[in-house]
Regions:
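Basic/polar N-terminal segments that are highly enriched at the extreme N-terminus
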Residues: 1-21, 167-176
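C-terminal cap/linker of serine protease catalytic domains
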Residues: 18, 146-176
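Residues that flank catalytic or metal-binding motifs in active/ligand-binding sites
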Residues: 21, 64, 88
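Short loop/turn microsegments at loop-to-beta-strand junctions
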Residues: 24, 63-64, 116-118
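Core segments of cupin and vicinal oxygen chelate
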Residues: 27-72
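Vicinal oxygen chelate
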Residues: 29, 33, 43, 70, ...
């Protein structure tokens, strides 16, 4: 992280109890770390911004570092200039129990229609997300290769995943 003078806001003494996650996703933004953290925490339940620090006088100017949680999962974000961009090689998977939940996250997050495919979308910051039904994990573990092939054929044609259509493909309904 760049050296510089620090200003802390919302800072509270942290007592390390050993419950700190081993891995925390860290997102690099040009200038939008605070804005993005507010956006994401407004969408997911059990979410909050836990700390914001501004480091002054860095080579990129002022640098914001934001700690936040999405559905209890810790994240960090940094505003450190336009050196790096998000791409599809990294995405966050959101497991959804209902079609309504899939529809909700899709509507809130999707900002690049041409990037929508097979349950994947891209948000207004360029970050990729996979919005998937929770049942997909069990479906894809099935040992019946014909079922897996039907489900795969179905979801490859979809943008936003449709639970009813995936279940229909899994059961073979409509197939001769």
């Amino acid at each position: 992280m760049p050296a510089g003078n620090q200003t802390r806001t919302n800072a509270k003494p942290q007592i390390h109890t050993g419950n700190i996650p081993k891995i925390t996703p860290h997102l690099w933004f040009d200038k939008e770390a605070k804005e993005a953290a507010k956006f994401y925490t407004s969408i997911f339940p059990n979410s909050k911004i836990t700390n914001t620090t501004t480091i002054h006088d860095t080579p990129s100017g002022d640098c914001d570092v934001v700690s936040f949680e999405l559905s209890g999962q810790p994240f960090m974000a940094i505003s450190a200039g336009p050196l790096f961009k998000f791409n599809e090689s990294i995405s966050f998977m959101v497991s959804c129990d209902t079609q309504e939940e899939i529809d909700y996250y899709w509507q809130k997050l999707s900002a690049v229609p041409e990037a929508e495919q097979c349950g994947w979308l891209k948000d207004k910051y360029g970050l990729s997300w996979q919005i998937v039904p929770a049942i997909m994990d069990e479906i894809m573990k099935d040992k019946d290769e014909k079922k897996i092939a039907r489900v795969t054929e179905a979801f490859l044609k979809m943008k936003k995943l449709d639970i009813a259509e995936l279940k229909k493909a899994y059961s073979g309904a409509g197939k001769r």
